[in-house]
């Protein structure tokens, strides 16, 4: 579905067009703020390798963790890449695009609040900036480096912590975004962390999305 035609999202799913549009808009906002700034995007965020992609061993095994009742997430922690970030609810704009966290708060992670709560049955979606208008790393700059099995912890408003394990990390061209694969679920509590990534051009912004797939493994 074309971004301009998407106006709403069901509670348990997120429009891929919306997320991709949000990334394009974020990159465009950087250009509006900075004009032509050759130094900002000389490098690019880390890209996941083929070893981090899905394989037979990447699918969940072992006991199933009982889903939690809904509760808002308040903090995201990924010790492996030094992330310890507050979370805020984000929604869709009038065009159906997922609103990223405020541009002035690159250390803030956003949770799609009209979707699944992290730890509940279904696929929860969190997003964050990969970088800032001045080229500094954002909260999700290093998502592309996460290895399988890496722990992701989300502290919730009910004082429980949903603990997830990374199953795979993949980079998708935004023109070939596999929405069913990304937003679909296995029936277990799952998590997706999504940010902009891939190549970057001053005309179109980032050309892809880095997606982290994770499954609930424990509750503390």
What are these regions (language model features)?
Residues 3-25:
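N-terminal export and membrane-targeting signals
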Residues 26-147, 155-160, 168-220:
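Solvent-exposed, non-transmembrane regions of membrane-associated and secreted proteins
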Residues 1-4, 219-220:
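Short, intrinsically disordered, low-complexity terminal/loop segments
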């Amino acid at each position: 579905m074309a971004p301009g035609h998407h106006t709403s999202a069901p509670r348990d799913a997120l429009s891929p067009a919306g997320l991709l549009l949000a990334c394009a808009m974020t990159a465009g906002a950087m250009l509006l703020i900075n004009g032509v700034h050759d130094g900002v995007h000389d490098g690019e965020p880390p890209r996941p390798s083929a070893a981090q992609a899905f394989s037979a061993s990447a699918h969940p095994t072992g006991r199933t963790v009982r889903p939690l009742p809904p509760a808002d997430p308040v903090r995201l922690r990924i010790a492996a890449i030094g992330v310890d970030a507050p979370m805020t609810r984000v929604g869709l704009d009038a065009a159906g695009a997922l609103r990223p966290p405020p541009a002035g708060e690159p250390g803030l992670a956003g949770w799609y609040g009209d979707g699944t709560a992290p730890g509940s049955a279904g696929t929860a979606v969190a997003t964050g900036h990969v970088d800032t208008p001045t080229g500094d790393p954002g909260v999700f700059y290093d998502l592309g480096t996460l290895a399988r099995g890496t722990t992701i912890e989300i502290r919730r408003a009910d004082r429980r912590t949903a603990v997830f394990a990374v199953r795979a990390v993949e980079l998708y061209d935004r023109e070939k975004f596999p929405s069913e694969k990304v937003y679909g679920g296995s029936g277990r509590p799952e998590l997706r962390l999504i940010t902009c990534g891939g190549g970057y051009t001053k005309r179109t912004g980032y050309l892809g999305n880095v997606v982290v797939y994770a499954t609930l493994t424990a509750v503390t």
